[in-house]
Amino acid sequence: MTTQKIVHTKSPDGSKLFRHQAKFVAGAMNINQIPNFSLPEIAFVGKSNVGKSSLINTICNNKNLAKVSNTPGRTRQINFFNLADKLIIVDLPGYGFANVPISVKEQWEVLISYYLRNSYSLRLVNLLIDSRRGIKENDKKVAELLLANKREFQIIFTKSDKVTDRKNLNDEAQNFLATLNYSCNVMYVSSRSKEGARELKASLAKCIKPQR
């Protein structure tokens, strides 16, 4: 792979797809419970309390779809949502949460890692980063895991309404991707203001299988 300038999505929006209702179809607390789908899967991964569930609810226009909590570590299983029989949206447990037993933390890490390495239908991973915190070491490890397994991913800076100066974040993302020798979309999104929702939907809609 060659290092390139960060790409910002300008493709047509995916609003037509996301007008449909998404529905919960499966949950997996261990690797044996992970289902196989014939539809393409798009996953959301990030540190605990980064806003994964809130973002999924925002783009799916359903505030009750994915369970949201202010308590880190609330999502304790992989949750799968079917969107119009076109896409499977995957909400992964958050990583980096310390206030759980080590055995539970290790179980989550194994579950996340196994899914990201082995899902046959996984087409795109959204690596969520809290705009207020920046890119942390465990975010880098996840990105390295994705690259090692040839997974396409994009960086999503969440809670963008909480920051005003984005130059440092842009520089950080640029340097981070350069060290990985990887080029991808970098977006700013906010579940509160809806900033970036249209661009994110457009990038996800690209993963739909072309009709024959």
Swiss-Prot record:
GO MF terms, alphabetically ordered: GTP binding; metal ion binding
Gene3D superfamilies for this protein: P-loop containing nucleotide triphosphate hydrolases
Protein keywords: Cell cycle, Cell division, GTP-binding, Magnesium, Metal-binding, Nucleotide-binding, Septation
Cofactor: Mg(2+)
Disulfide bond entries: none
The keyword Secreted is annotated on this UniProt entry: no
Family (UniProt): Belongs to the TRAFAC class TrmE-Era-EngA-EngB-Septin-like GTPase superfamily. EngB GTPase family.
Reported function: Necessary for normal cell division and for the maintenance of normal septation.
PANTHER family: ENGB-TYPE G DOMAIN-CONTAINING PROTEIN (PTHR11649:SF13), MSS1/TRME-RELATED GTP-BINDING PROTEIN (PTHR11649)
Protein name as annotated: Probable GTP-binding protein EngB
